[in-house]
């Protein structure tokens, strides 16, 4: 298969290099198109206000001065001279569990591939304090999942969000299909003073696990399993439709009231 590989940790990150090499070793034709620096937390942002510069690192690697979504969008809308068969994003150096997926550039790169018509997988290694030890485990999981997708494709609107515990392959207890859990509210932002005495802020850490019981992605990786969560991009809150529909009469009546 022709595999487009991207990430949000940047083109020089070890995770993407190990992933690309594992996919090549499995017989795939791999093109890496990734940000020229760390763009973690970029979510689905597209660069629309300035042109995007690219740099060929080698015949199989392109660095992009943009977001993960920019990378995949450019690659699939004319920058490459061929059409890939699948998008694989990662390997991220930290978890993308639960509502992390809303902010994740790793997941968003896969999501852009799905928007543009390709099967897509996001792969993250669940590290502690960003100290990664077993990228090879996550890469092997990605190779196995890509092979399964080729043999047994999923519906066209589905992205696979894969989280791999930072364990040796022989210590992983198995794969689990999971749903997204969620976290408590994020921790407070962190104020500091710059050298000129002005206040600057760092975004605070993610909140602790909240919905993290059996069946969730949090629980799977905590118990030594590789979590596979099928996700799609329909943000409709169906449970609220009837309640909001009950407002419509009053809202419509307000149109006839005084300005």
Curated annotation (Swiss-Prot):
Record GO cellular component, one term: cytoplasm
InterPro entries found in the cross-reference section: SurE (IPR030048), SurE-like_Pase/nucleotidase (IPR002828), SurE-like_sf (IPR036523)
Keywords: Cytoplasm, Hydrolase, Metal-binding, Nucleotide-binding
Subcellular location: Cytoplasm
One Pfam entry name: SurE
Domain of life assignment: Bacteria
Gene Ontology molecular function terms on file: 3'-nucleotidase activity; 5'-nucleotidase activity; exopolyphosphatase activity; metal ion binding; nucleotide binding
Binding site for a divalent metal cation: 8-9, 40, 92
Cofactor-binding details, from the entry: Binds 1 divalent metal cation per subunit.
Enzyme Commission number(s) from the entry: 3.1.3.5
Obligatory cofactor(s): a divalent metal cation
Enzyme class name: hydrolase
Catalytic function, reaction form: a ribonucleoside 5'-phosphate + H2O = a ribonucleoside + phosphate
NCBIfam families reported in the protein's UniProt record: PRK00346.1-3 (NF001489), PRK00346.1-4 (NF001490), surE (TIGR00087)
Role, per record: Nucleotidase that shows phosphatase activity on nucleoside 5'-monophosphates.
Family (UniProt): Belongs to the SurE nucleotidase family.
HAMAP family named in the record: SurE
Protein name: 5'-nucleotidase SurE
Organism: Xanthomonas euvesicatoria pv. vesicatoria (strain 85-10) (Xanthomonas campestris pv. vesicatoria)
């Amino acid at each position: 298969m022709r595999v487009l590989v991207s990430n949000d940790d940047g083109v020089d990150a070890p995770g993407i290099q190990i992933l690309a090499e594992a996919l090549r070793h499995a017989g795939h034709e791999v093109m890496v198109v990734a940000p020229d620096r760390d763009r973690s937390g970029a979510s689905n942002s597209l660069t629309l206000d300035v042109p995007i510069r690219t740099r060929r690192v080698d015949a199989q690697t392109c660095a992009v001065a943009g977001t993960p979504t920019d990378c995949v969008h450019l690659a699939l809308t004319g920058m490459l001279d061929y059409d890939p068969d699948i998008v694989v994003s990662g390997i991220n150096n930290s978890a993308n569990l639960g509502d992390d997926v809303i902010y994740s550039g790793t997941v968003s790169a896969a999501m852009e591939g799905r928007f543009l018509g390709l099967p897509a997988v996001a792969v993250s290694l669940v590290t502690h304090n960003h100290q990664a030890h077993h990228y090879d485990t996550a890469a092997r999981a990605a190779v196995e999942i890509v092979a399964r997708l080729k043999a047994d494709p999923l519906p066209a609107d589905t992205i696979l969000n894969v989280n791999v515990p930072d364990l040796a392959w022989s210590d992983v207890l198995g794969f689990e299909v999971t749903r997204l859990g969620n976290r408590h509210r994020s921790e407070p932002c962190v104020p500091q003073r710059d050298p000129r005495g002005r206040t600057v802020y760092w975004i605070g850490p993610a909140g602790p696990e909240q919905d993290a019981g059996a069946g969730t992605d949090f629980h799977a990786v905590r118990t030594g399993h590789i979590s596979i969560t099928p996700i799609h991009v329909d943000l409709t809150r169906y449970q609220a439709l009837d309640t909001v529909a009950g407002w419509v009469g009053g809202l419509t009546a307000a149109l006839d009231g005084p300005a």
